[in-house]
Amino acid sequence: MFKKKILLLWVLIFILTTFSACQTYDNFVAAFITHKSEERSTIRIGVYEPLSGDKKAYGELEKMGIELAHEVYPTIMGKEVELVYADNQADIDTGKTVARDLVEKKVSIVLGSYGSVNSLVAAPILEEAKIPAIAITNTNPLVTKSNPYYSRICFVESFQGVALAKYAVEQMHITGAGVLFPRGDDRAIAVTKAFSDKYIQLGGTISLSVEFTSGAEDYTQQLKRFKDQGVRVIFVPANIRDSALIIHQAKNVRLNCTFLGTDDWEEDDFLYQVAAAGTNVIAFSSLFDAQAGTKETDTFLRAFRLKYGYDAVPERATVLGYDAYIMARSALIRAGTVVRGELIMEQLLKHRDFEGASGLISFDEIGDPIKSVAIKTVRDKKFTTIYTVVPKWG
């Protein structure tokens, strides 16, 4: 009986000592109590995408990259990775429902969604559950700005404006630019402001700023104003249809200048429409350069061509989907846990010069990536990288 009392006393002393060493009860639990979910046989990663509906094709491109990375790296910490699919159908109500499903299925991290609105819908649900998420092609600043558990693998829209301004001043050596942007388009207005602010900061001047109505048929009056001002470079953050018309009509008014655009131009449809325009007429920012030069770029291209054919060309969303998966995998390994979301998110944001297929990736304090931007043009009826803008941070 006496021995039992002594043993019980020692147990109580151990527990009290342990609690006094822990700042909170949560820390005690995390340190000494094994979570049953840590013992599961697979590690679950959520794939939150529109896999049906009118946005299905875009969701499939991101999913293709995620699945390719999963084939290359099928395990984490010795356990098989299970991809858990959540079809948000690009619908707000459905998005909320399937985001909650991912929480119930105890995924460790979520990848997606295509469409910033879809990610914004899921964000508070994932934040409440402390489940980190990585957006793949969302360029809306709000995705990360007000959502501490969301990061992104692509750069924000405004940074494209910054990169193009640097290209115009530092590579083209043109210090007088014009901007031509669609009226009432918040996205275009934001990236135009970023371009203009950086251009002026670098010593340039915005000679002329003109709005136009998207969907119009004739832009010659606006283009003549740029010609009269002698503008040699014009930033046009517009869709493919409007941009192609503007570029062709510039020839009609004999406006000799270079048009700068965003990654929206990196589509086969745009290439077909402007292929005859020439190398010196078009330059745009891109989310991916096949010549990025990292070992992971080579790994990605080798796996992609093996699966889809040597001549297959990966879409940028597929490359970024691949990077989102391998970044998530790295964060889980670094955290050493699949259930402590706050620690996983902390380790995710600590990545510096991480080798992705799209280049070296670091994160700032809110989860936006710090990465190089490829500037491309049309050459021999193909998109070709002509310059890389390397950000200087710190």
Predicted regions and their residues:
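Periplasmic-binding protein-like
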Residues: 47, 102-114, 134-136, 178-182, ...
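Extracellular/periplasmic periplasmic-binding protein-like sensory domains
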Residues: 247-322, 333-335, 339, 377-379, ...
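Extracytoplasmic "Venus flytrap"
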Residues: 31-65, 73, 86-92, 114-117, ...
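An alpha-beta-alpha
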Residues: 150-214, 232-233, 309
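Solvent-exposed, acidic/polar segments of extracytosolic/periplasmic ligand-binding ectodomains
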Residues: 24-43, 349-394
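Extracellular/periplasmic bilobed ligand-binding domains
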Residues: 126, 176, 191-286
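Beta-alpha junction/loop-to-helix N-cap segments that form part of ligand/metal-binding clefts
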Residues: 24-34, 57-64, 72-144, 212-219, ...
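Hydrophobic alpha-helical segments within soluble ligand-binding/sensing domains
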Residues: 95, 153-177, 189-191, 218-220, ...
